[in-house]
Amino acid sequence: RIGIHGNPFHMYKFRSMYNNNNQVTFDENKLNVIKRPDDPRVTKVGRLLRRTSLDELPQFLNVILGQMSLVGPRPEMPARLSQYEWWQYKRFEVPQGMTGWWQVNGRANRPMHLNTQDDLYYIENYSLWLDLRILLRTVHVVRTGAGAF
């Protein structure tokens, strides 16, 4: 994944998909992979891990290693950078996080293009209070499974 200042790092995560699966579903422009509840690439155990957000737990190691923060924009996949507009690179001015404004405001229930806008909102309004608010809302989102699939 891509982290702060555009530096690549290995993001730890439990595998929730079949290895080397080519059954990808794209959006109407054939540009972005659609994340959907019935994704055929996700294993049965993976579905449980994702629904409970347990697949994210290994990222605490990234936080301990200083590669990620608890709160911040999600780390991006390198392949997606070629689709970025110049203004979207601002997401990399702060450490990437395990949770963030997009995750507590709908996650996969919202259009993917809004995640960059949510990340920019977070960056422009950063404060300890906002981080605490996001962490508290994360607990609620994880407990209810909202937007997780």
Where are these regions (language model features)?
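Conserved small/aromatic sequence motifs within transmembrane helices
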Residues: 1-149
